[in-house]
Amino acid sequence: MKADVVIVGGGLMGFSTALHLALRGSRCVVLEKDSPGRHASGVNAGGLRQLNRHPAEIPLAVAAAETWHRIRELVDSDCDARFPGQVRIAENAADMDKLEQRAAQVQSLGYRHEELIGRDELYRLVPALAPHCVGGLICRGDGYARPFHALTAFRNKACSLGVHYQDSTRVERVEQSGGDWRVQSQRGEFQAPVLVNCAGAWANTIASMLGEPVPLTPGAPMMMVTERLPHFIAPVVGAASRKLSFKQMHNGTLLIGGAHLARLDLQHESTEMNWRKLAVSARTVLALFPQLIDVRIVRTWAGVEAFMPDHIPVIGPSGTAPGVYHAFGFSAHGFQLSPVVGRILAELILDGRSGLPVAPFSIQRFAA
């Protein structure tokens, strides 16, 4: 099959890229070795977070936030997005000092979306919080969406614009022939002058085929969800010195994460819950919300992510293979960035440059 662009990876990054290219008239094929959103894209915490981003990611996160607030214009769905804000809690003076330094750093870069709040404002926003906390850092425009709803919306919109999608299509070999990339899979050959690697935890397999392996480490962040409860909290909650992502969904369940990792068998694409680490996550919640001690956990899961050594992604052109572009390694915080990453790749492919700064994300930072 011949196309303008072949995209490897049927997650949010792959479909966002396909969508933005299709909006500008490109013929795209998306190849997914499993089912759409089987790994990171469909099972993450759904955080729409500008708060506490790596400085290099801030311009992208701010641009992505603007898109999420009008996401229906892009994908004909609101993706169940909600924006109650997100707050990092300071439990003591040392935590507050850390948050003050962070706020000063963000302001020095010219941004004002992260706001220090004192104890009174914190308890006005989160009255159920344990009484020992002293303040926080908030981004009032942050929130969350439903990952599988978002993935479905991006996929459906892309396909409505003519994007061809094939699941259960594992890429076995990539080679250049003339001006095209020939992508061999167990379901046939696909050809295009442009190849995009959005293969997530398996992106290094594709990058290695192209002669530019990267130090990508697969990992499987765990999540817990509770029984339904009466609503008692609006903002998404994190902590300055603990691993925590805590939110109450509109159906009353609590979604609890924090980057504790499951045991992962990448070869067999299976995960096993690490109950000791889940217990740490549960104790963190109880330290901040002790009234939840009798609440039942009803489900746990893990999704396979790609982690980079510097915890920021690879976005941009290949350093060795003309016509190849990468978007992977989002290190468990790529969901919010997905609309703008697709836009960036479309700009790089079609215009040769992007309106957003992408140099920090170059794959060449890992070149030997």
Located regions from the model:
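N-terminal Rossmann-like FAD-binding beta1-loop-alpha1 element of flavoenzymes
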Residues: A3-V29
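C-terminal catalytic lobe of FAD-dependent flavoproteins
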Residues: A287-A368
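Helix-loop-beta segment of a Rossmann-like dinucleotide-binding subdomain
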Residues: S77-R88, H113-R119, Y123-L161, A262-Q267, ...
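Dinucleotide-binding Rossmann-like beta1-alpha1 core, especially the glycine-rich loop
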Residues: G46-L125, K243, T284-V285
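Active-site lid/adjacent beta-loop-alpha segment flanking the redox-cofactor pocket in flavoenzymes
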Residues: R228-G323
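Helical element adjacent to the flavin cofactor pocket in flavoenzyme catalytic cores
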Residues: L137-P193
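Glycine-rich FAD pyrophosphate-binding loop
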Residues: A22-G42
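Central helical "cap/lid" subdomain
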Residues: R38, E189-A234
